[in-house]
Amino acid sequence: MSTDDEFWKYNNDMIVRCLAGVSRNDRPLFLKAAYNGPAATEEISSYDPANLVFGILGGSAGTTRDCLELLKQAEKYGARVALFGRKIYQSECSISMITAMRRVLEEDISSIEGVKAFHDDLSKLGIKPKRVLKDDLELTEEILQVNL
């Protein structure tokens, strides 16, 4: 068992144990946590889907591909909410970033296609991207690379 494998199992176990000690009336409706990969997300999102919505945290800004791939993988494995504050407000254009995120989910395009569309949108708005397209297409988050 790898360290990462041990961590997500421990983390999910602690979340469930904490929730077990809370009465149904006081239990949260929404749970947010870091994305720890497919198995971790599937397990925690299926804990009590009728009463608890699972969402992921965005973490650091990273590349646009990191953002869109995280969103794609998290949704695929059960997350239903994404709290991506920094990934949105630190992007070149918040509206264009949200548009790219919606395209990836609603139009079922790949994170690569989403990054290209995001750069096209920035170009149309006359906004210079922080990274050239080649660099923004890089997937820098290890947890996301493993699950492609």
List each language-model region with its residue ranges.
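Alpha/beta enzyme core
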Residues: 1-54, 65-80
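Intrinsic-disorder/low-complexity, polar/charged segments
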Residues: 11-12, 63, 93, 111
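C-terminal helical cap(s) of enzyme catalytic domains, especially alpha/beta-barrels
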Residues: 75-77, 89-147
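Glycine-rich phosphate-binding active-site loops on the catalytic face of alpha/beta enzymes
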Residues: 56-62, 77-94
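Mixed-charge, polar/low-complexity N-terminal
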Residues: 57, 62-64, 68-70, 119-120, ...
